[in-house]
Amino acid sequence: MLRNAGTKVLFRAITLVALVLSGPVFAYSAEDATNVTSVVMAAVKDNKLTIAADNGVFTDTAPGIPKKLTVEYRIGDEKLKREVNEGGKLEIVVPDGQKLVVIKAVYGPADGSTPQQNDASIAPMEVLETLPGFTIEHVLKSERTKGVSWISMTKDPKGRLLLGAQRGQPITRVTLENGKVVKDETMSIPVTETMGMLFVDNVLYLNGADADGKYCLFRCKDTKGDDSYGDVESLREWRGGAGEHGAHAIVLGPDKMLYIVCGNFVDVPNDLAPTSPHRSYGDDLALKRAEDGNGFGAGRQPPGGFIARVDLDGKNAELYSAGERNTYDIAFNSDGELFGWDSDMEWDWGNPWYRPVHVFHSVRGGDNGFREGSAKWPEYYADSLPQTTTIGIGCPTGVVFGTGAKFPAKYQKAFYICDWTYGRLMAVHLSPKGASYTGTFENFVAPKSLHAKAGKTPLNLTDVVIGDDGALYFTIGGRGTAASLFRVTYTGTEPAAPIPASQLQENEGRSARDLRHKLESLNVNHDPSTVAFAWPYLNNSDRYIRYAARMAIERNPVAEWKEKALAEMQPHAAFTSLLALARLGAPETQPAIMKSLSSFPLDTLTEEQMLEQLRVIEVSTLRSPAVVP
């Protein structure tokens, strides 16, 4: 009882420190926002409040700036406050016998900024900054009076850009010559909320909603030959999640399969192929999960956000990897490796389980450790994989590798990631590290107002592509905000001819990546030869190799490798194989697991090995709770 009370005090103290340090991020200014108390009070019906945080409901006093609704209210003697970002919905239900009283409601800039003073579309180089030798141009502004706000982008076989929109708005197609718009047209494809778009040859794939609000993977063909792509077929429905926490980007893999990243509210497809590599997942946390205090994601079980792999007909689905939160976009580098840019849960700031926004390497069968509420895994859990590059805070949206850009070689190899909240387009520079990568990052494009005393310049980036002209194009928009298309070119003195993708490949780490791929290829079917091949790699110093070897071994019946695991005396190999046994073995195996672990005194182990040993104990007691009291 005292321990629980102390924990609560500690968590509150940590949260308070975080709020103090973060300063204006959580604040709003009364002068810059609109008092909407009367509107919110009028929305209370039958002692219940349901209201959308939307520019259509409230006056938009800060065009182009993301906003939030803040409501202070009282239930009985308790004074409370709730916040919801623009585009969301606030619901407050009061227990029987108590009354809801709205004290104050404010709708205004989410980060406490002043209303828009600078429009990046007018003179981008005056209010935006980029690296030496690069130039930013404004290309096109949306018709905001019609509510068009661009949230995704792709390139068709003719090099035209397709700009996807939100809230019932259509797709815009833009034809460019020398970076100038010569034609922009509205397409009549009956799909909106297009958060994923991809051309494969002359076929357009979309993730979005149809006229009935059903979220699906669509295939659009130009069967009439009139450039309309009006032959629309639903290949797969995405259940559970929709929109911003739904199915997002679609990319074509080196294997000519579609890789589709889904947010944490999408249900795992119920038709997974037997070859599906990500299996046997759970919360697997010793402390009972504390759900989010506002109920966001409460009750949703692992695997969290995931990447699905399907064929070009949307069939033969596999759960390729998981344990992300709400990744919006993914991309393959020139080595054929898949990377994503995952979000945080900003309401967790200050709590021990907070996970910052980060770049991750998605490998076959990988688990990146996201769970809902307080159940998020620390990076050291051996049954997960670590972050590649930790960024900090932000709102991840579109990504692209610089392959094909007319940039210096360093920036052709870079991984470009969009931050919607802080208006940053960052360049991540990845370097091989064993069978994976590590990385550093820098701001490639950002508002000068991020560090200068000036009026805020909204630059809520949504997506990014490399055009056929070698320029980088990015869009801003989302949640009804003003949308624009920008172009970045290199005008410096360094060589900038596009380098073929094959010449951008990394020789460093190639043998380790090849070994990892070989082990991953064994995580498909039962093969009696797999255990003998993979076993030596359980003791590899590379965590990615050990992970792939364990997953390959787990594909085979426990009876084929149980005794080897219990007899293993090399620490890494023992703990990795015993982790597999803890995950998949029968409960009665647990005493033997504990006995094997006792063969490794703590003073003989490295810190990493001690954590691996602890993880085996944790998973074993969680999955066989009746054996150890």
Explain the meaning of each model-derived region.
Residues 12-24:
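Bacterial N-terminal signal peptides
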Residues 62-80, 134-144, 543-555:
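Hydrophobic/aromatic-rich, well-ordered segments within soluble, folded domains that form packed cores
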Residues 75-85, 143-152, 336, 407, ...:
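Short amphipathic alpha-helical segments with coiled-coil-like heptad repeat character
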Residues 114-521:
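Beta-propeller domains with acidic blade repeats across secreted/periplasmic ectodomains
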